[in-house]
Amino acid sequence: MPDPGRLMVLTHPRPACGRPLEQVVAECVGAGATAIQLRDKTADSRTLLETTIRLLAITAPAGALLVVNDRLDIALAAGADGVHLGSEDLPLPSARRLSPPDFLIGYSTDDPDEARRAAAAGADYLGVGAVFGTRSKPGLADEAIGPDRVRAVRKASGLPCLGIGGITPDNAARVYATGAGIAVLSAVMSAPHPAAAVRQFHQAASPRARTPKGRRQTP
């Protein structure tokens, strides 16, 4: 089964840098993003399908995964690598039944018990958050769960996890230290240079970056 890896970038239909989404996605996977999640709550089905097909032509040759937020029908029709679902979307057992064996299904939860149920129902990875306060969903700022909850969800589920919500290059090491990867939207899509932002996250993932200040690494 494919794995979303260490860094998933969620898209915005209009990146702040002003360049076309396809160009920004190409820059991100070229800089090392391991997965792209196409997230567009406003596009009609035809537009979303066409965008998915165009992005897949970029991600596949680069060895990155492409998952579609919410829309299993679009993901399957386009031949995407997977779909990401929430608690109000299609139930996991139904999504699993409709999908081919190697199709990746992600699920959002911050609750260890729900994470266990999601794993049993067919989820392949979990998005866990909001870890910190987030600009994309300001109402969640007071409900930040922190890295320890990410660790707890990962342990309970036994699945690959991606911390999400308010993650920046300055705090990403705290999430990577839990054994999870990260998923980011604003930190990349709002950046003037998205590829540079992706590279900063990779630097945060290095063992040196995850070593607490004042503690020397063992050679």
Range-by-range predicted roles:
Residues 181-184:
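C-terminal binding/interaction regions
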Residues 142:
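Glycine-rich ATP-lid loops
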Residues 1-92, 97-125, 145-148, 152, ...:
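Conserved N-terminal beta1-alpha1 strand-loop-helix module at the mouth
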Residues 38, 75, 133-139:
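A short acidic, helix-capping loop that chelates divalent metal ions and anchors anionic groups
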